[in-house]
């Protein structure tokens, strides 16, 4: 067999280029209808990859929304996507068409990391029987272990005391509060999943926090986007292992905790935690190949709850303290309400929330302004849908831009400013506009929302009950900007926590 040389090689190259362009043209042609959402013209093969800033997607989408409207299209590689913006369009997609937009697309990097049929957890699982079974189990089990009940409130209250002790130990010193906040929230989640609490100085806890941070960084930005666009790259020997070291380490940590729990589990005793309850379900369905209760799915469900339940709440608390040192007038007013309703001795309780409209408004405004999850995880349409008179075909990937709702200029008086009055009426009563969607909406809304609301209220009020927070002397005023991607955390900052005196 002769090797191709000269003119032959040129012929093959030209044929390959023409073939790629024809395939690209066919991909585009199926979307060239008068009712398909408009968008920037994609490049061959790369699509719009070079036309958006993957390190600051919310701003890129904001500019595109201003140009093309609330519903516009993008193409990332071969994949066509439709971005949904604004309250009206978001309600149509997540609520009106909720049944047809609840599915998830396949994501190659997650498949490489072990997300596959039978072990997809809750967050990434396709919309169907397995997802329903696991979501129903997670919601009911968390409820049985105290979600919204007094038992869980006691756990959070006790952890709030440990958190205050940690701040007391460093009172008056410039500190970055993030590690302490992460520790507190992690312990609440660990209590629910493993019935276990870690001391804040525990090397295992410190290691877990670092690995979790690394794992989230690995699945965001340019490299994972390119791997998803061209999954053949995942077959390059050694590349995936190097790119996803944090993910592998996190999986090993979770597996170790599950092994410890499994070794002490007594099936004849009532379950101590969510893991025990899942193990009991595995025993019940032994021999049923269609059940989603298995060891692999246990690992994924725990990963879902542990990662999503921890980083979102701790990051929101970090935003809360930053905004308090930037707005001391708001901080003083919250403390006045705490003193009037709770006092400075009794521990805050969830029952206090209804009598604290200003504090409640501040917590909600922190969530709106912090906007820690600007982009929902992608959805995929299971049938043709109509949104704002546009026709979105079956199999289209949807990107819900939640930031566009939390900053919707038609809803919020001062969308780009921290303004707790967004959640107060003229009489000072708490109100919640329908555009407040930090936990998403519809069938895929965050199952841990009740837990997050409890943690935010109890941790925040306990901290402001005991401390006043300020910018350290001699340091510049921190910026109130976030660092994309998920979760959008504040730029690193320091604060001083000073213990409040009685009556102050």
Curated annotation (Swiss-Prot):
A molecular-function term among this protein's GO annotations: oxidoreductase activity, acting on paired donors, with incorporation or reduction of molecular oxygen, reduced flavin or flavoprotein as one donor, and incorporation of one atom of oxygen
Record's bilayer topology term: Peripheral membrane protein
**Sorted UniProt keywords:** Endoplasmic reticulum, Heme, Iron, Membrane, Metal-binding, Microsome, Monooxygenase, Oxidoreductase, Phosphoprotein
Query: Single GO cellular component annotation?
Result: endoplasmic reticulum membrane
Q: Which Gene3D superfamilies does the entry link to?
A: Cytochrome P450
Keyword Transport listed = no
Quote the CDD domains the UniProt record gives. Answer: CYP2D
- Residues bound to heme are 446
Q: Which domain of life is it from?
A: Eukaryota
Q: Name one Pfam family in it.
A: p450
Broad class of where this protein is predominantly found: endoplasmic reticulum
The protein's matches in InterPro entries, at most eight in alphabetical order, are given as: Cyt_P450, Cyt_P450_CS, Cyt_P450_E_grp-I, Cyt_P450_E_grp-I_CYP2D-like, Cyt_P450_sf, Cytochrome_P450_fam2
Q: What subcellular locations does the record give?
A: Endoplasmic reticulum membrane; Microsome membrane
Q: What is its EC number?
A: 1.14.14.1
Q: Which reaction does it catalyse?
A: an organic molecule + reduced [NADPH--hemoprotein reductase] + O2 = an alcohol + oxidized [NADPH--hemoprotein reductase] + H2O + H(+)
Positions where Phosphoserine occurs in the chain: 249
Cofactor(s) recorded for this entry are:
heme
Which family is this protein grouped under? Belongs to the cytochrome P450 family.
- Function (record text): Cytochromes P450 are a group of heme-thiolate monooxygenases. In liver microsomes, this enzyme is involved in an NADPH-dependent electron transport pathway. It oxidizes a variety of structurally unrelated compounds, including steroids, fatty acids, and xenobiotics.
Name of the protein in its database record: Cytochrome P450 2D10
UniProt organism field = Mus musculus
Per UniProt, what is the name of the gene that codes for the protein in this document?
Answer: Cyp2d10
């Amino acid at each position: 067999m002769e090797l191709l040389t000269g003119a032959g090689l040129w012929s093959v190259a030209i044929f390959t280029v023409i073939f790629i362009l024809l395939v690209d043209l066919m991909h585009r042609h199926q979307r060239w209808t008068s009712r398909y959402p408009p968008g920037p013209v994609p490049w061959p093969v790369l699509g719009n990859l070079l036309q958006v800033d993957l390190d600051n997607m919310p701003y890129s989408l904001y500019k595109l929304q201003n140009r093309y409207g609330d519903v516009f299209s993008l193409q990332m590689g071969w994949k066509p996507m439709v971005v949904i913006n604004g309250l009206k369009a978001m309600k149509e997609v997540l609520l009106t068409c909720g049944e047809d937009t609840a599915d998830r697309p396949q994501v190659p990097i997650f498949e490489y990391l072990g997300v596959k049929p039978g072990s997809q957890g809750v967050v990434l699982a396709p919309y169907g029987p397995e997802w329903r079974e696991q979501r129903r189990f997670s919601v009911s089990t968390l409820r049985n272990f105290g979600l919204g009940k007094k038992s869980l409130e006691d756990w959070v209250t006790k952890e709030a005391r440990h958190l205050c002790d940690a701040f007391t130990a460093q009172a008056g010193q410039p500190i970055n509060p993030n590690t302490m906040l992460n520790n507190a929230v992690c312990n609440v989640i660990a209590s629910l999943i493993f019935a276990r609490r870690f001391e804040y100085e525990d090397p295992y806890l410190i290691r877990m926090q670092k690995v979790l941070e690394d794992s989230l960084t690995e699945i965001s930005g340019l490299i994972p986007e390119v791997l998803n666009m061209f999954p053949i790259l995942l077959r390059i020997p050694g590349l995936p292992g190097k790119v996803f070291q944090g993910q592998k380490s996190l999986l090993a940590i979770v597996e170790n905790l599950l092994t410890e729990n499994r070794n002490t589990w007594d099936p004849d005793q009532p379950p101590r935690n969510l893991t025990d309850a899942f193990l009991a379900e595995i025993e019940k369905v032994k021999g049923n190949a269609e059940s989603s209760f298995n060891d692999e799915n246990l690992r994924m469900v725990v990963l879902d709850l542990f990662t999503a339940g921890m980083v979102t709440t701790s990051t929101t608390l970090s935003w809360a303290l930053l905004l308090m040192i930037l707005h001391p007038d708001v901080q003083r007013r919250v403390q006045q309400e705490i003193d009037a309703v709770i006092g400075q001795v009794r521990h805050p309780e969830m029952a206090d929330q209804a009598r604290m409209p200003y504090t409640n408004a501040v917590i909600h405004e922190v969530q709106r302004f912090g906007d820690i999850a600007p982009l929902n995880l992608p959805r995929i349409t299971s049938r043709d849908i109509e949104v704002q008179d546009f026709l979105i075909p079956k199999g289209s990937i949807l990107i819900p831009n939640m930031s566009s709702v939390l900053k919707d200029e038609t809803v919020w008086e001062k969308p780009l400013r921290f303004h707790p009055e967004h959640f107060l009426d003229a009489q000072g009563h708490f109100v919640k506009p329908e555009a407040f969607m930090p936990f998403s909406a519809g069938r895929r809304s965050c199952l841990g929302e009740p837990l997050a609301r409890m943690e935010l209220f109890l941790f925040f009020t306990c901290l402001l009950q005991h401390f006043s927070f300020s910018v350290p002397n001699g340091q510049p005023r921190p910026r109130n900007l976030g660092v994309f991607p998920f979760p959008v955390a504040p730029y690193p900052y320091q604060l001083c926590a000073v213990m409040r005196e009685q009556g102050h």
